[in-house]
Structure formats: C-alpha cells, structure tokens
Amino acid sequence: MKLKIITVGKLKEKYLKEGVAEYQKRLNRFSKIETIELADEKTPDKASISENQRILDIEGERILSKIGERDYVIGLAIEGKQLPSESFSHLIDQKMISGYSTITFVIGGSLGLSQKVKKRADYLMSFGLLTLPHQLMKLVLMEQIYRAFMIRQGTPYHK
C-alpha cells in the first residue's frame, strides 16, 4: 500500500521540515509514502469573495491533477468528521483491507479545499475546530498516521 500526502504550499520553516522528515523516515517501514507540495496562489489581504473562489479553484485543479483515479481520498477540512486516534487507525486499516492501493490525504492552502476537491474526497476529516497553519497540519497529519500504524502494531507509542 502507498500513502500520498498532497499539500498546497511548501514547507519553509526548518523545524517543520525536520519533523516531517522524521515521521517520513518512521513511516517508510510500514508503507511507501509520497509527499507532493503544490504551489499556492498569493491571496491578497482584502481579497473579495470571488477572488478567494478563483484561488480555491486554481489550487483545487492542481490538487485534482495529482489524485489517482482509484485513490481513496481523505480531505482535511474543518467541517469534516473528527475521529479519535483508534478510529483513524481503523479507517486506514479498513481501506488497506478493502484493496485500495493508495490512500491520499489532501491539505488545502490558507483558504482550505475547493468544492471540487471536497466532492472528489471519499472522506472529509477534521482535526478539530482550531485554525492551524496548513504547513503545521502536514506535521500533525504525519504524526497521526504514524500513531495509527503504532496502534495497529499494538506498540506502547499510543497510550
């Protein structure tokens, strides 16, 4: 099985890059993992609703171009379903058993995900109502994926 993480925007801060690299190294023993960083559109401070929509649509098309036809897609969105770590682990496990060769996670840019991306997603997931920088979200997601594999293995990592 392969895991794919698609993000809008590139990691800039050294501490985030190091954290992501550490979890990518840990995850490699369980699954092939591919991370794709897409260019983000510049969003003016006082952008109109139509300008924000245009930006979402452009970023959404970039995201959709990287999703395989048979991928199981989990979009991260504030309105998505919140899961405890054990249920998240079970979700990944079920998709592996169901025969999906790739589980793709999608993290949008500062404006979130376009409606087309949300529609393409098989599952919308939320990490809570807090607003987090999308770059930090990549690190949080990778830690939770690693935790899911540790739960599956029955290791004491998840207490």
Curated annotation (Swiss-Prot):
GO cellular component: cytoplasm
Binding site for S-adenosyl-L-methionine: 76, 108, 127-132
Primary localization class, coarse: cytoplasm
Protein localization: Cytoplasm
Record-listed E.C. numbers: 2.1.1.177
Disulfide-bond pairs as recorded: none
Molecular-function annotations in GO: rRNA (pseudouridine-N3-)-methyltransferase activity
Keyword rRNA processing: yes
Keywords in alphabetical order: Cytoplasm, Methyltransferase, rRNA processing, S-adenosyl-L-methionine, Transferase
Top-level EC class as recorded in UniProt: transferase
HAMAP family linked: 23SrRNA_methyltr_H
Family: Belongs to the RNA methyltransferase RlmH family.
NCBIfam families in UniProt: PRK00103.1-3 (NF000985), tRNA_RlmH_YbeA (TIGR00246)
Purpose of the protein: Specifically methylates the pseudouridine at position 1915 (m3Psi1915) in 23S rRNA.
Protein name, as recorded: Ribosomal RNA large subunit methyltransferase H
Organism: Streptococcus agalactiae serotype V (strain ATCC BAA-611 / 2603 V/R)
